[in-house]
Structure formats: structure tokens, C-alpha cells
Amino acid sequence: MSAQNSTDPMGATNPENGGATATDLKGKGRAPAAQEPVEDTSMAEDDDDDDDEEDPEEEPEAADDDNMEEIDLDNVIGRRTRGKVIDFANAAQENPADDDDEEDDDDFVEDDNKMDDSKMDED
């Protein structure tokens, strides 16, 4: 037999793919190998040089942002409701709930027949 026409079920090499085995190229869940990206290190070196020059400029700006002014105690609000006992029965009597929702429901008229007639006309 010739070498080109023979098949080796255990993983024959394929001369067209640089000697890669057939199992490397085919199979469930196997994607073709992609070329690895080449990193450009020349830009990274330039960035390092720029960072050294910018560091002294940033330090004085940080000192200007400190505004340590006194806090006006009139603007501080106390403990409003923490620790207070609320009598909900008394609060309900003083502030009755609005019954507007129930009154609005009486005004609503549903037009079921009108919608059914329009559907029959379309057919």
C-alpha cells in the first residue's frame, strides 16, 4: 500500500497540515486553532516613561481638594423617628384614609359587546 492512501484509525498524520494528527482537526467541540496575538511592547515602554513625568504634577492637585470646613450644626437633623413609639390607631383616626379609589370604580363601564362586534366584522 502507498503511504498516501493508507488510513490509520489510531491517529494518522496529515502531511497537508504540517504533520498534525487527524484527531486534532476534527471532533466534537474542537475549534480550529487560531494564531496567538503578538503583543506590541513598544507602546508599553513609552507609557512607563510618560507616567514618571506626570507623577510630580499630580501631587499638588490632591492637596488642593481638601476642604476641611466646619460643619454647621443647624444643618444636622436629629433622630426623627428612631426609638419613638408610634400609636398607629391614634394616627389612623387623625389621618383618615382616602376612599377615592372605591368611588372611581363605580364610574367605569366596560364595553365587552362593542369589542366582540368589532372582532366579528373583521372575520
Swiss-Prot record:
Chain intervals with Acidic residues compositional bias: 37-73, 96-110
A cellular component annotation (GO) from this entry: nucleus
KW Oxidoreductase (keyword) present: no
Subcellular location: Nucleus
Signal peptide positions on this chain: none
InterPro entries xrefs: Histone_chaperone_domain_CHZ (IPR019098)
Main location: nucleus
Pfam families reported in the protein's UniProt record: CHZ
Residues that span the membrane, as ranges: none
Ranges of Basic and acidic residues composition bias in the record: 111-123
Known function: Forms a chaperone-bound H2A.Z-H2B complex that acts as a source for SWR1 complex-dependent H2A to H2A.Z histone replacement in chromatin.
Keyword Chaperone among UniProt keywords: yes
Full protein name: Histone H2A.Z-specific chaperone CHZ1
Keywords recorded for this protein, A-Z: Chaperone, Nucleus
Subunit structure: Forms a heterotrimer with H2A.Z-H2B, stabilizing the association of the histone dimer. Also, with a lower affinity, forms a heterotrimer with H2A-H2B.
Organism: Chaetomium globosum (strain ATCC 6205 / CBS 148.51 / DSM 1962 / NBRC 6347 / NRRL 1970) (Soil fungus)
Ranges for region Disordered: 1-123
Lineage: Eukaryota, Fungi, Dikarya, Ascomycota, Pezizomycotina
Protein family: Belongs to the CHZ1 family.
